[in-house]
Amino acid sequence: MKKSYRVKKEKDFKALFDAGHSVANRKFVVYCLDRNLPHFRVGLSVSKRLGNAVTRNRVKRRLRHALMDMSSQLENQDFVVIARKGVEDLSYQDIYSNLVHVLKIAKLYKD
């Protein structure tokens, strides 16, 4: 995923948490904020409660891969995906389907 597609700065995360709205399902929480950008930007948050660094990095890699696979269907907004406990045990297909579900609730996923 290119750097231009990532939310990296603390002020951007803070703006998303303060001014954005949130939706959730059992595996993910998504905060989103509409900005006039030519493409989406995403930030990922995986807590230490999910496991050691290897486990957390595996979850982040799978999330990035799923987001790039669905990039043509995503709205041009900033959003942060927060992984909840239990996502570390899911397969890629389960992560993908749960992510699509929560993004549809947030109205970030176009069919």
Curated annotation (Swiss-Prot):
GO terms for biological process: tRNA 5'-leader removal. It comes from the Bacteria. InterPro entries: Ribosomal_Su5_D2-typ_SF, Ribsml_uS5_D2-typ_fold_subgr, RNase_P, RNase_P_CS. GO terms for cellular component: ribonuclease P complex. One of its GO terms (molecular function) is ribonuclease P activity. RNaseP catalyzes the removal of the 5'-leader sequence from pre-tRNA to produce the mature 5'-terminus. It can also cleave other RNA substrates such as 4.5S RNA. The protein component plays an auxiliary but essential role in vivo by binding to the 5'-leader sequence and broadening the substrate specificity of the ribozyme. PANTHER family: RIBONUCLEASE P PROTEIN COMPONENT. Belongs to the RnpA family. Consists of a catalytic RNA component (M1 or rnpB) and a protein subunit. This is Ribonuclease P protein component.
